[in-house]
């Protein structure tokens, strides 16, 4: 994912947490914040130490990034934060992508022309 598509600063995370809306399923929590003047989506990731050691946490982050990258063109330009829950450590890529697509649909993150 390119730098301009990442949320890194604590103030950006706090803004999304305070002003945004959240939706969750078993594996992930998704916080979204609409930014009217923004042209591209920005993603922040949070993977707790409860999920496993560094190898497992980094694998989960890679899977999430890849799933978002594949869906990027279909998503609205918003800020969102994905927080991985404990079951996310055991998911394959296909399961991760399916779980995230479910959250994207529930929060209406897909653009109107999408057939999702």
From Swiss-Prot:
InterPro entries: Ribosomal_Su5_D2-typ_SF (IPR020568), Ribsml_uS5_D2-typ_fold_subgr (IPR014721), RNase_P (IPR000100), RNase_P_CS (IPR020539). It catalyses: Endonucleolytic cleavage of RNA, removing 5'-extranucleotides from tRNA precursor. Consists of a catalytic RNA component (M1 or rnpB) and a protein subunit. One of its GO terms (molecular function) is ribonuclease P activity. GO terms for biological process: tRNA 5'-leader removal. HAMAP family: RNase_P (MF_00227). Coiled coil: none annotated. Belongs to the RnpA family. This is Ribonuclease P protein component. Keywords: Endonuclease, Hydrolase, Nuclease, RNA-binding, tRNA processing. It comes from Bacillus velezensis (strain DSM 23117 / BGSC 10A6 / LMG 26770 / FZB42) (Bacillus amyloliquefaciens subsp. plantarum). SUPFAM superfamilies: Ribosomal protein S5 domain 2-like. The lineage of its organism: Bacteria, Bacillati, Bacillota, Bacilli, Bacillales. RNaseP catalyzes the removal of the 5'-leader sequence from pre-tRNA to produce the mature 5'-terminus. It can also cleave other RNA substrates such as 4.5S RNA. The protein component plays an auxiliary but essential role in vivo by binding to the 5'-leader sequence and broadening the substrate specificity of the ribozyme. GO terms for cellular component: ribonuclease P complex. Its EC number is 3.1.26.5.
